[in-house]
Amino acid sequence: MANNKSALKRIRQTKKRTERNRYFRTRIKTITKKVESAVAEGNYEAALEAWKEANKKFQGYINKGILKKNTARRKISRLHHLVKSIEPSA
């Protein structure tokens, strides 16, 4: 266990950051799974709506500094390719 004040503060900060990171990691996974499950069902409308919601969330995470810009855009792009793969041809 740490003995000096600065080490104790670092431990407190690490706990707080770990909790926050865990929260956002699970949110990202949940958002992604929502799109993937709609694609797996073959429901284009639901998949598109889920993708729009994911896009909005990821853009917010970019603005808050939770996700790096390229990481979020890569995730959005991959999800969009999934949704487009089940798009009904007109």
Swiss-Prot record:
Assigned keywords, A-Z: Ribonucleoprotein, Ribosomal protein, RNA-binding, rRNA-binding
InterPro entries listed in its UniProt record: Ribosomal_bS20 (IPR002583), Ribosomal_bS20_sf (IPR036510)
SUPFAM superfamilies the record matches: Ribosomal protein S20
Molecular-function GO terms, alphabetical: small ribosomal subunit rRNA binding; structural constituent of ribosome
Domain of life: Bacteria
Coiled-coil stretches noted in the UniProt entry, renumbered to this chain: none
Pfam families from the UniProt entry: Ribosomal_S20p
BP term (GO), one: translation
GO (cellular component) term, any one: small ribosomal subunit
Family: Belongs to the bacterial ribosomal protein bS20 family.
Purpose of the protein: Binds directly to 16S ribosomal RNA.
Record's protein name: Small ribosomal subunit protein bS20
Source organism of this protein record: Nautilia profundicola (strain ATCC BAA-1463 / DSM 18972 / AmH)
